[in-house]
Amino acid sequence: MASRSCICQVSAGIIFLIGAALLVAGLVIVLNVFPNIVNNQINDSKVLGLNADGTLNSFTDSWVNSKYISTMQYWVYDYTNTIGIMNRAIYPDVREKGPYAFDEILTMDKLNFSENGEFMEFRQIQTFVFNPNKSCAGCDPYKDKVLIPDMGFQVGIDQIDTVIEGILKNPLAATICHAIMKGKPNANQTCSNLGALIEGELGTLISLFNVSPFTTVTVDQLLFSGYKTPFVEKFLDEALGMLHFLFGTAPKPLDDPPIQLNPLNGTSDIINTVLTGKTDPLKAGYMTEFRSISNNSLFNSIGNTLPPMWWPYANKTYCKDPNSALVLTGTNGDYFKNFVKKTDILPAFVSDVCRTIHFVFDREVTVKGFKGYRFVMPPTQFDYSLDENCGYCIPLKYGSYEYPAQSACLPSGLLDISQCTGGPIIMSKPHFYQASKVVSKFVPRFKPTYDNDETMLDIEPNTGTVLQAQKRLQINMLVNQFKHIRSYSVMRPGAYPLAWVNESFYMDQNTIDQLNSQLFTPVSTVNTICWIAVGLGAGLIALSIVMVIVSFCCFRDEHHKTS
């Protein structure tokens, strides 16, 4: 009997050792070895470059020839109370029309790799094709019209007001006036009053040419094809010519290009340079510079520094971090680094706002079965009370909202990109979401919400793959108040909305299959095998313990019987 008990205990010991080995091996593999293998595989595969035969490697090919489902949706604003805005300082009231949906086709060309394989050049072209099936019922951008603030009017009235002020201060004009008023009492005061009268009645003169601060355009003209401003066509050219004839003051020649919100449909002048990730896979796709093919200095970065004319006040002495606004860093938002953590701040250069945006973690999400992290654009990005945003302040020539002339910058929630675009364009989140109160109340009809107005990036954290994204921005125009021109001295100065946009990206089936085949299927398979081994090992250990206990009990009973 003792022999059988001994055999049982030895067998239990062997089973225990086998179980312990399976348990330890399974835990080591699932918790240490395999994650390292997967991490190395992800890093090795996320490098932009070529195969040995000169073709694009898998990662580069999937990016360059992306099949993501991309749609650009526009909602445009139709102003309904322009008379009240101009004559009674009423807040703007608008009707929102849309969405006008456009299929976005992304193509890349002019690919080039540096000799050392560290850098890649490319040009990305966006082409937009109207899709009535995704748009609002009956919406037609080529026929639908909206009444909007005229950007050309604002630029033109600013320029002519400057010219008139220059003329009135011209010694020749003063001499002529005094000659006319010769011998009359208070000639100086009369000439001064006459100058103020001329400037004050400029609006009346302009109205004779059937020109207004607002104009009617089609949706397509506003977005893509462009419109010619009536202010230049009907008034400014003739008025400046008359002033030049009378006073000999040569005005600056006026360009009259079409005005549109998206002038780059189907074309691009920019060559981007990014890191390939050869040295550091976590920096794959990081922007290092961009340049204009036509050598337009406005669109040439200086290495990883944005064009200084975009943010000309970034180097002012009162900015504690003068270079913060000019830093070019991060990817272009098509993908992000591997192994994203919730505490990470993800940089991306967003050309729509002419600056780098830093995204922060918001919440966990699930997209088509994949677990992801949602990152959003925090309100701190447009908060000018923060030192790092000092360089984005553009002094207000005429003042705006409750801010006086020459104020340091706009209220928080707005971004002045006029130096980058060449027009009085102000960017914000749609419906002034998260903007300061003085901004959010400017259009009382707006009711901003997180779901409709926040920019969202849903990212698979292991690979940095964008599962889906919603880039939401509002395009506004800065309307100034010309206090010396009576007809325009009442209008509330501020950011008048023109349109808001939702540029959405969704994974295509190929991306889903790649994530499954390259990452999740192998991980799931190995994890399953390892945890089965762990479970089997734990079961064998439990079995061996039971065998020892049973053997001990049986041996003790037999021992009592024989004794």
Swiss-Prot record:
It is a multi-pass membrane protein. Glycans are attached at N43, N112, N133, N188, N265, N295, N315, N502. Residues 35-528 are lumenal. It comes from the Eukaryota. Keywords: Glycoprotein, Membrane, Transmembrane, Transmembrane helix. Residues 1-13, 550-563 are cytoplasmic. InterPro entries: CD36_fam. GO terms for molecular function: scavenger receptor activity. Pfam families: CD36. It is found in: Membrane. GO terms for cellular component: membrane. The keyword Isomerase does not apply. The chain crosses the membrane at residues 14-34, 529-549. Belongs to the CD36 family. This is Uncharacterized protein C03F11.3. It comes from Caenorhabditis elegans.
